[in-house]
Amino acid sequence: MYRLMQPSDRAAVVALWQKERGDTAEFINTAMDRFAGEQNVYVAEENGQIEAAALAVPVTLQGRPGNYLFGLCGQGSLILAGLVDTLCAQQKLRGAGFTVAAPTSPERAALLQDKGFQKAFALRCLPREVERNLW
């Protein structure tokens, strides 16, 4: 079942996030409370356990409301795909015109691409000569 996180789910979400991403509990709680807001944390529950989680951080781009998919964690591509679908659909109902994401691995990038996300830009390295700037 995909749904919004309830306060009673917080410890399980923090534990899952720490296991998957290695962040501190302080960082995770700050992300949920101050970055996304508790009302924008989505979870996938299976057999009474939290199996996946993601934040839908509210953003505005050139006056258009949308969200930033952040902290996607969990195992199983079907569970993660369902969570992304639910998050995007619910945010669209709330008026979000777009969802952006920065995948943390090639596997996550492939999952998001399968869900219709497109690469908008990529980081690239431009080599150039560096001169000492001592005078």
What is each model feature region?
Residues 91-104:
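Conserved GNAT acetyl-CoA-binding A-motif
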Residues 68-79:
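A short, internal acetyl-CoA/4′-phosphopantetheine-binding micro-motif in the GNAT/acyltransferase core
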